[in-house]
C-alpha cells in the first residue's frame, strides 16, 4: 500500500493577505517562518512505525490553496493538523476523498473536535497516533476503517518511539531539525 503522510506548514503569518491586513507582530513573521519550516515529527515517527510492506511518502504541502494537482498514486492519505490550518487540511482531505482515496486525520485540532473532523475524512485518530497506527493501516488494507481510533488516555512512552524517518526528507529544505524530549502537558485536565 502506498501511504502519503501530508504535512501542512502550521503558521500562515507569512501569508500576503494577512500581512496586507496588518495581522502581524514585530519579529513574529521571522520566527514563524522558522517554525513553519520544521518537518512534522509526528508524521515522521508514524513513517518509522510503518511496516516495510508499505511504501511511505512524506509530502510537505506549504500552501494547500496553491496545490493544483494532488500528489497521486496513494492508497491512503494521513494528514496531521493544528487549528491554524485546519480549514486548509479539511479542503485537502475533501479533495482526496472525492478522488476515492481514504483519508485519516489526526493532530491537536482533530483530537479536540473529532466530530467536526470526521465529516472530512474516513477516520480520525484521537490522541497520539503511534499506538494505533498499525491498526489504521491494517483496517485500510481490509477496507474497513473504524471511523474513530481513540488512543486515549495518553500512556504512550516516548522512549518506545523509533527515530523519526528523517531519511524521507530532503534535508537541504530545512534550516534545522528538532528532537522530542517530552510531549504534551503533564496535567490531566478534564
Language model feature labels by segment:
Residues 1-190:
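Acidic, low-complexity intrinsically disordered segments
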Amino acid at each position: 500500500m502506498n501511504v502519503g503522510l501530508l504535512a501542512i506548514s502550521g503558521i500562515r503569518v507569512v501569508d500576503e493577505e494577512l500581512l496586507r491586513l496588518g495581522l502581524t507582530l514585530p519579529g513574529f513573521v521571522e520566527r514563524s517562518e522558522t517554525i513553519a519550516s520544521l518537518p512534522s515529527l509526528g508524521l515522521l515517527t508514524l513513517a518509522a512505525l510503518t511496516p516495510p510492506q508499505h511504501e511511505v511518502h512524506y509530502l510537505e504541502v506549504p500552501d494547500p490553496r496553491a496545490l493544483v494537482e494532488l500528489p497521486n498514486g496513494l492508497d491512503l492519505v494521513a494528514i496531521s493538523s493544528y487549528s491554524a490550518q485546519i480549514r486548509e487540511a479539511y479542503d485537502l482531505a475533501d479533495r482526496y476523498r472525492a478522488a476515492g482515496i481514504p483519508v485519516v486525520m489526526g493532530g491537536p485540532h482533530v483530537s479536540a473536535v473529532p466530530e467536526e473532523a470526521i465529516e472530512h475524512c474516513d477516520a480520525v485518530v484521537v490522541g497520539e497516533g503511534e499506538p494505533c497506527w498499525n491498526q489504521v493501516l491494517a483496517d485500510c488494507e481490509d477496507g474497513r476503517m473504524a471511523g474513530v481510533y481513540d488512543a486515549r488516555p495518553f500512556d504512550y512512552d516516548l522512549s518506545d518511539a523509533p527515530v523519526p524517518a528523517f531519511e524521507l526528507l530532503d534535508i537541504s529544505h530545512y534550516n534545522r531539525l528538532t528532537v522530542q524530549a517530552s510531549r504534551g502537558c503533564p496535567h490531566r485536565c478534564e
